[in-house]
Amino acid sequence: LKISVTGSGDISGNNISCTDLDISIAGSGDINSSNITCNDLQVSVAGSGDMKLNNVTANFTRASVAGSGTAILSGSTQEAEYSVAGSGDLLASDFVAKKASASVAGSGDIKCHATDFLKVRTSGSGSVGYKGNPELDYPKKGLYKL
């Protein structure tokens, strides 16, 4: 299932259940959704748009923000890959992952929650904040405990 906003439109949807879900914003639009169940979740915000996904259950999640937009996730996933390029924010501290990787290029921020393992990479002034007590693979800068 693919849900996308291009430009300035807004989408709201609840109670989504599918195998693979691809949700994207390109531009200044907004997407709000609750109660999502899927195997593979792809989330992308490019531009200044905002995405809020509540009560998500997924096996694998890949979420990216490019530009000044914001993605907010809550719920749980087995494995997550997060990336921010630019000044955007990826807020997933209420999205519990067993294993996660987080990469920031620019001045953006990622907030995440990992229980078993967290790999962090930063370049620029961006940072990664985390909850949980995972094994860490991280550089000397840009990581802090929430």
Spans of model-derived segments:
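Extended, compositionally simple hydrophobic/Ser/Thr-rich segments
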Residues: 1-146
